[in-house]
Each structure stands twice: as structure tokens, then as C-alpha cells.
């Protein structure tokens, strides 16, 4: 099987997983949404807060504490910083700031990698910092609007406004990343013939 055929198959699996999740979500519409919560892992990219659904998270690694080396690869898109060897498994590491065209300062100081799993594929996302797990009430999550201007709405699965105080006058907007959309777009970019 050629590399391009293998990558095409992975893209198909990601799309299939996204369709299955969408179908399952449709079945839950109309249930008591007010009492349901969405468990996410919060993190920072370029001083902005984002989140990923916790069920996609395989693990969170620190390259220094876990003694992980990111090995760079020739001939790959700029956003792929390299690969890591995690207990014998080779995992690609994507710099989300470069992928989303965000400011990429302090790259040498970044040590946090969120390992996500989707459609039997594991990928690492290089992020500035990880804030931990949070529960967002489903009724408080809004569809992606223009509030988050730095990332295309195609890559967002919603926004959550976290109040800084009881008056709700200062709220932090947290963009919820659509993992399937990111991985599908990333795979499609790799399949396009271009000079890296």
C-alpha cells in the first residue's frame, strides 16, 4: 500500500468517525440538555484559551518531564514539528499555532503535547500550556461565531464563555476545537502535491 493510499484511508476513517459522532449527537437532541455537560481539556495557544473534548485525549505529555525528544522530519508541512517515540509508538506532532496560522513566538519553550486519538490514529498537538479538565454545561456552549477571529470557524465546534466574576462583565471566550475537522484538513493538506 502506498503512503498516499494509506493516508487517504486514514482520512476516510476520520470522516467516518465524524459522521458517526454527528449521528449519535442527533439522537441525543431533545433530551434534557440543561443537565448535561461536556467534559473538555483546556489549553492555551498564543495567549488564547481553547479546549478539546476529553474523550479524544489519549494522554498529555511534557517533553522535559517525560524525557521525550521531538525528531524533525524532512519534506513535511511546516506545522508538523516532527515525531516522538511514545513507548514504541511513533506519533506525529503538529504545532497547532502554525496549523492555525497563529503567532508562533516562544516555540523553543513549549513542552506540552496533547496526544489525541481519533479513528484509531494518534497525533500529538503541541500547545503552550494545559490548564486541566473542565465541565462545560451544554446549554452554555454556543455555536462558533466570529468571537474567535484567529481560527477559522471550520475548526471550531463551539464557544464557551467563562465568567471572570459574578457580574459576567469580563468573560473568557474558550474555543472548542473540532478534532475531526482538524485531522481531516491536515490529512487533505498532506495529500495535496506541493513543495514543503
Model-derived regions, located:
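An acidic, low-aromatic, low-complexity terminal/linker signal
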Residues: 1-196
Amino acid at each position: 500500500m502506498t503512503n498516499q493510499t494509506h493516508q487517504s484511508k486514514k482520512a476516510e476513517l476520520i470522516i467516518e468517525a465524524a459522521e458517526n459522532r454527528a449521528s449519535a449527537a442527533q439522537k441525543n437532541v431533545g433530551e434534557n440538555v440543561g443537565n448535561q455537560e461536556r467534559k473538555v481539556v483546556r489549553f492555551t495557544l498564543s495567549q488564547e484559551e481553547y479546549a478539546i473534548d476529553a474523550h479524544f485525549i489519549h494522554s498529555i505529555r511534557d517533553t522535559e518531564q517525560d524525557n521525550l525528544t521531538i525528531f524533525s522530519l524532512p519534506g513535511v508541512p511546516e506545522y508538523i514539528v516532527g515525531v516522538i517515540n511514545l513507548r514504541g509508538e511513533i506519533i506525529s506532532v503538529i504545532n497547532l499555532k502554525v496549523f492555525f496560522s497563529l503567532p508562533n513566538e516562544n516555540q523553543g519553550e513549549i513542552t506540552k503535547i496533547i496526544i489525541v486519538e481519533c479513528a484509531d490514529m494518534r497525533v500529538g498537538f503541541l500547545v503552550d500550556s494545559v490548564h486541566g479538565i473542565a465541565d462545560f454545561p451544554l446549554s452554555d456552549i454556543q455555536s462558533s461565531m466570529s468571537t474567535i477571529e484567529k481560527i477559522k470557524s471550520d475548526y471550531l465546534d463551539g464557544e464557551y464563555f467563562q465568567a471572570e466574576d459574578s457580574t459576567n462583565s469580563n468573560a473568557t471566550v474558550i474555543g472548542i476545537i473540532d478534532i475531526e475537522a482538524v485531522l481531516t484538513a491536515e490529512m487533505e493538506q498532506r495529500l495535496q502535491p506541493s513543495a514543503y
